[in-house]
Amino acid sequence: MKSKTDPAKPHIVLCAPRQTGKTTLIERIIREARESAAGSPIPIYGFQTKKFAGSDGTSRIYMFPAGGDLPVSIPAEARYIGSTCGRVKDVCPETFDTYGTALIRSARPGGLLIMDEIGHMEKNSPLFLRAVFEALDGDIPVLAVARYTEGDAAPAGQPPKAGDQTVSGDYLERIRRHPRVRLYMLTEDNRDAVYDEVRDILFTGRKEAKDHEPL
């Protein structure tokens, strides 16, 4: 029995500096998936992370279901992944391996899997990273963000050249070079064009394209 998804379509990975619109792009894709112009809305799976700044300058980071309301049964402690204050202060690998893994593996055929974002905090979470690569090996469409570091540069839709040492963390480089991934280096100049390409890849053949405003 064939999957409801199209195995020929690439997964999408975005890589960009801060304040270039990657979160806005993902939120637009999520809204459009839910506002299907033809047929049923596309289910959203996966995770998004959010920072909450404290009065002492420390930002605490929590994991949430992608595009969804948080179940009241999931306490904040179970979603806490770490904190930063200019740099990483602490990390909770168990949250990635338990809650994060469960959110990734909840994805079902016919849906869209969001992973926003994958960075350096996950390096000691093997179960989570295994789930990430299983998703990239699979046919459920993935829209993910990989952490940007200085030196990351490649044309939109293209992987970095062989030998480039552009990503800290072997797993981040493996994500970018995965054979099923189409990598987009997002900038303020190309973000609208990238949005058009991403929505075409994810939605063509599934729902009518709709007019949209620039990001």
Annotate each PLM feature:
Residues K2-K9:
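Phosphate-binding P-loop
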Residues L14:
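Hydrophobic anchor at the beta1->P-loop junction of P-loop NTPases
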